[in-house]
Amino acid sequence: MSILNCRPSFDGVDTDDACCGAMASACCVNTKEDGESPSAGSPSGTPQSLVLEDVQGYDVEFDPPLESKYECPICLMALREAVQTPCGHRFCKACILKSIRDAGHKCPVDNESLMENQLFPDNFAKREILSLRVKCPSQGCTETMELRHLERHLVRCDFAGVECSQCQSSFPKYSLQKHKFEECPRRQIFCENCAVAMALEDKLNHDQTCPLAYVTCEYCQTNLIREQMPAHYSMDCTMAPIPCMYYEFGCTEKMQRNDLARHLQEFTQAHMRMMAQTLRSFSSSVTPTSHMPDISFCDPSQFEPAPPSVATVHSTHTPSQNDCTQETRNLRETIEQLEGRLVRQDHQIRELIAKMETQCTYVNELKHTIRSLDNRLGEMESQQCSGIFIWRINNFNSLLKNQEEERPVVIHSQGFYTGKPGYKLCLRLHLQLPSAQRCANYISLFVHTMQGEYDSLLPWPLQGTIRLSILDQSEGVAMQDQEEVMDTKPELLAFQRPTVARNPKGFGYVTFMHLQALKQRQYVKNDTLLVRCSVTTHLDLISPRREGFQPRSGDGAL
């Protein structure tokens, strides 16, 4: 006899109904059946007694689709902890209990009277539902499994969502490690200057206050670490504005530190007058004033001698005329000494200015020599590339920001040679503005010829093949460089022998690469874009031996 059709009897006269009632009671007492474990009723493996009463049906995708007989009429999902009513309807345990408590003691389907103690577990339906196959709910996973094994699968599924412990965002399990160590804005990094650990998103704020970061002096453009800058401003910077050292005597001039000596020389007399005026004011302020009492000739009592105690006090607190005269004499001697010191300092300043001018001339000569050597070194380095040149464009994000703000971005690389001897070339990169017609937001890349050391030895125009690439800097995966190959066109001015330092005519691609494509791969790494240029000229392909040339045989042994 099927449990699905049993109906408990309240009159005790129907033996079949009584049997069904007994079986229902047995099912209510013991939910184990056919050797199933207590965890069979829940994919999570929890015993039935621990299942929360407010959990609705299984909201998963079945394969094949779920039959309607296994759907809960209340939540319209697969039955969870299926129970059956005396009227033969199935519900999720949590759904029907909530319905009875909220809507009254009746069946939601046919409004038959229904009490909580009349519900009994439908283990047959429960076992059938747990045996149905479902699709993994994780996006990207194509596996299917029985419903009873879903929770176990989710524990090991590489597509299941897991939370990043650093930024609390959810990611597929297979990409979590890459996110934590390469992409997470909260991943830990170390300051390259002071080695302090911080989150990546805090790096910008730290860089603005890092005591060991290099900063540029706003006056002389010298690069120093931040903690040295206050001392540099107050003592060393030759361009920093400072007040005259005689500002306490009244000089209000301000000048750059390297102009202080000239100012002291030009205003020596003025400074001396200021000092003399200050000292005279000080001297007059200490000149003794009359402490004689006011005498009224109409009052004879004023001529009476004062009591001895009053005279003593008066003499104690009043400086004598001799003391004031001595102090004035001392002040005059001090003025004479300071005037002599000013004269000596004036001579010293003149000597220092002469020495400084000599040193400045020498420094300028050294700068010119260093600049020449630097240019020569750059020229030698450009000759060593042998036709393969890699251009490192630093601070590329700032260039992108300028482009977004409609500010033109055009930069040229340093020159390089195709060989030794060889043609001298350079690259030009242009970020097209968002408002540009037909090429908005594109990277334009061109090649220009330059005047080189071997131009008189080379055939013109330049002929050969040029390969331009923007390098993919990804690690651990197959790199996908953005690459274009072009052949030179001798009839164009771009490949003729240049008559100026850099040929204004270039040859290349206006729409070499869209800026959005930079985000698809790691073309920009550490704020740096790498552009590669490989040039193969016809000189590299032609044999140096002239056609028809016959090598001379040896003269033989003597």
UniProtKB/Swiss-Prot annotation:
CDD domains: MATH_TRAF6 (cd03776), mRING-HC-C3HC3D_TRAF6 (cd16643). Pathway: Protein modification; protein ubiquitination. Residues 321-384 form a coiled coil. The keyword Metal-binding applies. It holds the Pfam family zf-C3HC4_2. A zinc finger (RING-type) spans 72-111. It is found in: Cytoplasm; Cytoplasm, Cell cortex; Nucleus; Lipid droplet. GO terms for molecular function: tumor necrosis factor receptor binding; ubiquitin-protein transferase activity; zinc ion binding. A zinc finger (TRAF-type) spans 148-204, 205-261. Its EC number is 2.3.2.27. Gene3D superfamilies: Apoptosis, Tumor Necrosis Factor Receptor Associated Protein 2, Chain A, Zinc/RING finger domain, C3HC4 (zinc finger). The keyword Manganese does not apply. One of its GO terms (cellular component) is lipid droplet. Keywords: Coiled coil, Cytoplasm, Lipid droplet, Metal-binding, Nucleus, Repeat, Transferase, Ubl conjugation pathway, Zinc, Zinc-finger. Residues 386-535 form the MATH domain. It catalyses: S-ubiquitinyl-[E2 ubiquitin-conjugating enzyme]-L-cysteine + [acceptor protein]-L-lysine = [E2 ubiquitin-conjugating enzyme]-L-cysteine + N(6)-ubiquitinyl-[acceptor protein]-L-lysine. GO terms for biological process: intracellular signaling cassette; protein K63-linked ubiquitination; regulation of apoptotic process; regulation of canonical NF-kappaB signal transduction; regulation of metabolic process. Homotrimer. Homooligomer. The coiled coil domain mediates homo- and hetero-oligomerization. Belongs to the TNF receptor-associated factor family. A subfamily. E3 ubiquitin ligase that, together with UBE2N and UBE2V1, mediates the synthesis of 'Lys-63'-linked-polyubiquitin chains conjugated to proteins, such as IKBKG, IRAK1, AKT1 and AKT2. Also mediates ubiquitination of free/unanchored polyubiquitin chain that leads to MAP3K7 activation. PANTHER family: TNF RECEPTOR ASSOCIATED FACTOR (PTHR10131), TNF RECEPTOR-ASSOCIATED FACTOR 6 (PTHR10131:SF152). This is TNF receptor-associated factor 6. It comes from Xenopus tropicalis (Western clawed frog).
